[in-house]
UniProtKB/Swiss-Prot annotation:
The lineage of its organism: Eukaryota, Metazoa, Chordata, Craniata, Vertebrata. Apparent precursor of a secreted, cationic, proline- and cysteine-rich peptide that contains Cys-Pro-Xaa repeats. Unlike cryptdin, the proposed mature peptide region lacks the structural motif characteristic of defensins. It may have microbicidal activities. GO terms for biological process: defense response to bacterium. Disulfide bonds: none annotated. This is Alpha-defensin-related sequence 10. Belongs to the alpha-defensin family. One of its GO terms (cellular component) is extracellular space. It comes from Mus musculus (Mouse). It comes from the Eukaryota. Paneth cells of the small bowel.
Amino acid sequence: MKKLVLLSAFVLLAFQVQADSIQNTDEETKTEEQPGEENQAMSVSFGDPEGSALQDAAVGMARPCPPCPSCPSCPWCPMCPRCPSCKCNPK
């Protein structure tokens, strides 16, 4: 029985030593990274800084044209001088 307890204590000690060596290796790897890395910032953009034509079209579709004074059925009234071409939406 004493041999079993002693053997399991050695096995647990071996696992602990191995885990400590792995943890120390991870800490060394973190310190070997470039100094000042936490102060660096990077911005990534996948588009035109002023916006794309697709975004402009989506904004135009989201905002309906204001009703013209002569026709209450606007924004789709063909008689309105502004709404058929959607020039009343700012871009």
